[in-house]
Structure formats: C-alpha cells, structure tokens
C-alpha cells in the first residue's frame, strides 16, 4: 500500500521548482520514515538533498520501500497545476505516479515512471566551521543587487558580517549583512550567480535558512521546516578566481 496525503502542496511545488532547474531526472526513495532524494547536476556543480519526514504528511502509508524514478520537468508541469489550498495525494499504479489535487475541483494526473540506471550520489560530508542564519528574502535581494554588475559573486565572512561583492566591467556592488553569530575565522569563496538563482527558486520552502561556507569551499544552503519535519539543502561548488 502506498498513499501519501499532504494538505500543503506548495512544499512539493517549491522544492521541485528548484530541483527541476538543476537536474533532469531524480530517484525519490520512500520508506516508513519518509521521503528523500539526493541528486547532482550533470556538470557536478550543484548537489541537492530533499527530505520530508513521515510526520509532515496528513496520511502516510508505505508498507514497503519504493523508488520513484521521474523526469523532473514533467513532474513540475503537473505540480504547477496545484493550488496552495488543494490537498495533494500521491499513489502509484503500474508504471505511473498518480497525483491528485482536490480543492474546489478534483484534478488527477499520471506521470510516467522512467527507466533510470541511478547510482544515488552520497551526501558530501564537509566539515564547515561557519554556519550563518540569514532570511532567504535578504539573500535573494542581495543576489538580485549583485547580478546587475556581474555573473559571479564573492561571499566573505568575518566575525561581524557576511559580505556579498562583485566587480563588473562598468560597475561594482557590495552588500553587507550583520550576522550576529560568533565567528572565529574568516572565509571567502566565489560562486556563479546563475546557480545560486536556481537554488533560490525554493525560497518558499521555509524561512528557516542557513548558509555554510569555507575558503574556496562549496557553499551550502539549508532550508529547514519547523519541527525538523523537512529539509531541502543545496551544495554549490566554488568558482576559481582565474576562471573566465
């Protein structure tokens, strides 16, 4: 028996809005504890992890582990047809994931499961010394400010602030955020703005957002649901200063 019911489909929609812009195909693993996926883009630049606990769902029935191989673009087309006040139900039949959205009207879609030889990438274990809480709205606006002058951005952290900075051909930009954390060391790295914008498509997943960074190390963005019922995280490889 497989049946998942969620009264807030926006959690799925915002997750896969970001995920579908990063990877073409995913394998969603579901068992009695919850739903999870781990994926990396073809260029091995961005890694994504999604985990939704069993307790998040209104109804959660999964009597044996199941793997759902899906085309993310096709899944996102369907999720876009949901409304925030719909109730979403996930079931399966032979070769299909069935999504039902019920509100003022009832909509049912079947998304074909695909054949996928998939080696689930293991989640990188990076020993960060710096983890900074930052409202995702502030991060998004900072990136919008920076991208008018450059296609890459440097993140720099010291004991007082997080600084986002870019130097362009015709203009420069610097955004400073007082993080209020106890930071004992400095860190700096450069990242592609286009990749950060893909990650920030998930901004509505949660307001509980953190950044981890190290010098010339990947940037990790964490979005956590309340009560630890869900986590969406992205790990972005840095750009080297000498890269064109």
Swiss-Prot record:
InterPro entries: DNA_clamp_sf (IPR046938), Pr_cel_nuc_antig (IPR000730), Pr_cel_nuc_antig_CS (IPR022659), Pr_cel_nuc_antig_N (IPR022648)
Any Gene Ontology biological process: leading strand elongation
One Gene Ontology MF term: DNA binding
Superkingdom per UniProt: Archaea
Keyword annotations: DNA replication, DNA-binding
Subunit structure: Homotrimer. The subunits circularize to form a toroid; DNA passes through its center. Replication factor C (RFC) is required to load the toroid on the DNA.
Protein family (similarity comment): Belongs to the PCNA family.
Physiological role: Sliding clamp subunit that acts as a moving platform for DNA processing. Responsible for tethering the catalytic subunit of DNA polymerase and other proteins to DNA during high-speed replication.
Protein name, per record: DNA polymerase sliding clamp
Organism name: Methanosphaera stadtmanae (strain ATCC 43021 / DSM 3091 / JCM 11832 / MCB-3)
Lineage, top ranks: Archaea, Methanobacteriati, Methanobacteriota, Methanomada group, Methanobacteria
Encoding gene, per UniProt annotation: pcn
